[in-house]
Amino acid sequence: DLSMTGFDEKELTDLLGADADGEAKEDDFDLSAALEKAAFVQRGDVWTVGRHKLMCGDATSAEDVSALMGDTKANLILTDPPYGVSFKSASGLTIQNDSMKNEEFYTFLLSSFQRMAEHLEKGGSAYVFHADTEGLNFRKAFIDAGFHLAGCCIWVKDSLVLGRSDYQWQHEPVLYGFMQNGKHHWYSDRKQTTIWHFDKPKHNANHPTSKPLDLLGYPIGNSTQENGVVMDTFGGSGST
């Protein structure tokens, strides 16, 4: 009953327009362009956060990584790339480049490892968090980028991560190695083992697979000295 609106038929027609009963028409508004214009951070931006540097860039781009590192050589790589497992959190968070096909994913990893290796000191060590299901691609790319694979450490979590597998995952492997162009350095004792027990974060609304800080601090302490430079071109899963 139009009378209930307080307007007569002519007033409603003028208010709603002549096409009010027609189909909705697509306008020329470019949502992608508007979002890019509104974005606070742009590709190529390098932010100084205390003693740290954070870049919005491409881990496979020699130009981007060079812009970040300049003439500085990292003493250590501690990186947490996409695992290639199409991860999606319960809240809907996903990870970019986490759903590549086999050969494409290997090429992606190789290129990113090569970029990091170019800015690592001679004999510099590297730790790479990864998924067992993509272990072959990670190991092959790691070795092909010039690293010696010295071992694989295991992060044992305090609780399982519920997923689609028959056996629920309660660990993550971490490749450990170093560049073969020089002597690598070790700053801990000979009692450290390949099994790392650290509780996993309870929740992080900003990143679906963040690592606990004490977990990351452990290999950093073993493989660098105070004021060492640690590089992760994948943003440290929101941690480093």
Where are the model-predicted features located?
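Core catalytic lobe of class I
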Residues: 1-240
